Regions:
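Conserved small/polar residues in nucleotide/adenosyl-binding loops
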Residues: 390-395
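Extended recognition/assembly regions associated with phosphoester-bond processing machinery
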Residues: 1-45, 50-389
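Extended, polar beta-sheet/loop recognition surfaces of beta-rich domains
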Residues: 398
């Protein structure tokens, strides 16, 4: 059996203030083209279809186009979808019975009653049956009715749901899951585009994945194995943060042969409309580095000029049309970072601003600039004193209290 492993489409996502819907429509079209070429039996999508629980009409339309294009392929392709933590389980489940008749298998919610089990989809090839278990994002509160005792951790919740299943380990079994898996305490490599919970409470140990010949995982945005080679995060199809600059995005294609053999894994490169790039250097260097193949990319720019550049933002925007951020890294900015929080809090507001101005501009303020700052600071003090006078108790109030 051959299948594509996708996850974390995050359709409708914005990168800083840029709408990425055009890039997402483009990359999904390229995935369809790869499916037409490689002819997988199935496409597994391991959660976070959308970026928000209530996606826009445009985002829903883009995913509809993707499913329709996959459904039109010959030979037929089955699509298996689970909900991730960004998705609304009920919205993902909408029309799932009708869609199943068109080879689109959806699981929005994990089992929540004792009668329910994980949704299973079966395939048959020359080596026998392949069982695909569709396990959506699980929280302890979702599955608390499955047993009489308490379930307090994500690890307990996922383990409970999987161990209830009657999994035939003589067959080839695949799990599609969207959780934060760790291997003997080792966490996967993350990026800035992911939402993490404090204290590791979302961690699920990969030991629970042992019954499966392949675990198609979602939730982590960088492609990687976690523990065994069979446990894989495929990563996002696009770069969704500056921290992912330089990451090569791919479609994970997996072939399962006879039971007991390792899966054959191939990473099919994806070429985005726009890459995320980091550019570091003097203003003139970055302006001169502009070329037809990068001026439309998403760029994070760090300027290292020691002498203050004139209107750097305006100049850069004339060359690069998708600037994510402009930062300054030079001797002056590094000195500012050397101030401790206690030192900053102990400074008089006027003295603090004078120090800041001199460090940023390499000169003292002019008389006019000094007068403006003194007026602003004195005005703030007067407002604060008025507020204090207005809210303080009068002597009469104190005498009667």
């Amino acid at each position: 059996m051959k299948f594509f492993h996708l996850s974390d489409l995050h359709i409708g996502k914005q990168l800083h203030h840029y709408n990425m819907i055009a890039e997402q429509r483009d990359i999904l079209g390229k995935i369809v083209a790869l499916a037409e070429r490689e002819k997988p039996d199935a496409v597994l999508i391991a959660g976070d279809i959308y970026d928000t629980p209530v996606p826009s009409a445009e985002a829903v339309s883009v995913f509809d186009e993707f499913l329709t294009a996959l459904n039109d392929l010959e030979p037929e392709v089955t699509v298996c979808i689970i909900a991730g933590n960004h998705d609304s389980a009920k919205r993902i489940d909408f029309a799932s019975d009708i869609l199943a008749k068109h080879r689109v298998m959806i699981a929005g919610m994990p089992p929540v009653t004792r009668e329910e089990t994980i949704r299973k989809v079966s395939f048959f090839d020359a080596y026998g049956e392949v069982c695909i278990y569709l396990l959506p994002f699980v929280k302890p509160s979702y599955v608390r009715n499955l047993i009489d005792g308490d379930i307090t951790t994500y690890d307990e919740a996922v383990r409970l749901v999987i161990e209830r299943e009657n999994i035939d380990t003589a067959k080839r079994n695949i799990l599609v899951s969207h959780q934060f898996y760790t291997a003997a305490g080792r966490e996967p490599e993350t990026s800035d585009s992911e939402i993490r919970m404090v204290g590791g409470i979302e961690n699920v140990d990969t030991a629970v994945l042992e019954p499966f010949d392949y675990a198609a995982l979602g939730h982590i945005h960088r492609k990687q194995k976690i523990g065994r080679v069979q446990n894989r995060y495929c990563g996002t199809p696009l770069q969704y943060s500056v921290s992912e600059a330089g990451d090569e995005k791919t479609v994970t294609m997996v072939e399962l042969l006879e039971k007991g053999s390792e899966p054959h894994i191939t990473e099919l490169p994806l070429m985005p409309m726009r890459r995320v790039r980091k550019m570091i250097g003097h203003l003139d260097e970055i302006l001169n580095a502009a070329a037809e193949d990068n001026c439309h990319d998403y760029v994070s720019i760090t300027l290292t000029d020691e002498v203050e550049a004139y209107q750097p933002k305006e100049k850069l925007e004339q060359v690069y049309d998708h600037i994510l951020e402009i930062k300054i890294d030079n001797e002056r900015t590094r000195k500012i970072l050397e101030f401790s929080e206690e030192e900053v809090e102990s400074l008089d507001p006027y003295d603090a601003f004078v120090t800041f101005f001199q460090e940023m501009n390499g000169r003292a303020m002019t008389e006019d600039e000094d007068n403006v700052i003194r007026t602003v600071i004195n005005g703030e003090k007067e407002v604060a004193e008025c507020c204090l006078l207005y809210t303080s108790p009068s002597p009469r109030d104190l005498s009667t209290s």
